[in-house]
Amino acid sequence: MGFVLTTSGQMQIVVRDDAAAMTKLLKLPVSKRLGSLAAMRGVSEFDEPAMKQLRQIHERGDGFRVGVDDPRYPAALKRLIEADAWGQLKRDLARAWEYQQSVLPGIHHAETVDVVLTLGNPDDPVFIERTLGYYGMGSIPGSIWMVAWPTDYNVTRIGACGVHELAHNIRTPNVEGHFDLEEWVIHEGLAEVFTVEVCGPDSTGAWYAPVTGKLLESTWKKVTEAFGTGRSFPDWTPYVLGDEVAGRMGLRPVGVPHMGGYAVGREIIERYLAATGLKAAQAIVRPTDEILAGAGLKPRTKS
């Protein structure tokens, strides 16, 4: 989607409260649900690339299945509504942007950020058990997309997940150079620590909580030794998201635990912040090489 960048400090965060529309959608015949979903998302059914992406999410990805009449769906949607998931997003994203502006005004940002939360697929064990039933994508300025299947853990952290994605939205237009594995790992580390600064220490981190001690040491070595390698996301994904996600995408495993790159990224950022005295909201615009050096890592020559 298109977006307009500014340094005004005025960001309009538009959280699409689709709860009522999704409730109606789930009462429709299965044959009409994809069209209804497209209308909710502002997608023309004649826009083949957009419809293909929508089908990918809701037929093979982590979105709820548009071709299935599943009695669990209305109950799950009701639980998101009762948890005020969309309200969480509105409040926490507004608070996060206010915090960012108080710490470092004058940075580049999208004038408007469009935020979408959709219901997830309960039958994917990696999504439910390992990714804890929720995640988002927010690296394209002006857009945050999130998916959730409500659980006891995630229903109070939907807003925090949005804050993580807002950090990506903020960093992308403020750093120059090409995207690579190092930048992806730093993106995730910054987003995690930024979320902690805004929402507190218990708001995030469970995805990679087991990656500590000796496992973190071995993962650190595996991931940082891959810096400077690869040319695209299929090359880097196993080092960031881990072998389980890589395997389901048909990619080569590299010996990294689930979300191991997040744990490494957070460790890099925490080392950098300790060395500089900065906060993540200040470091969010700092160059990759500076952050790596501050964390005691040498930038690697690209191969």
Would you name each region that the model predicts?
Residues 1-87:
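N-terminal low-structure segments adjacent to metalloprotease catalytic domains
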Residues 2-18, 181-226, 300:
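Post-HExxH zinc-binding segment in Zn-dependent metallohydrolases
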Residues 38-47, 225-303:
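Pan-zinc metallopeptidase signature
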Residues 77-141, 155:
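Auxiliary, metal-adjacent structural segments of Zn-dependent hydrolase domains
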Residues 101, 167, 171-175, 195-203, ...:
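Hydrophobic/aromatic-lined pockets within catalytic cores
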Residues 146-161:
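Short pre-active-site segment immediately N-terminal to the catalytic Zn-binding motif
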Residues 151, 174-184:
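Short helix/strand-bridging catalytic loops that position acidic/His residues to coordinate divalent metals
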Residues 160-173, 188, 192:
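Active-site recognition of the HExxH zinc-binding catalytic motif
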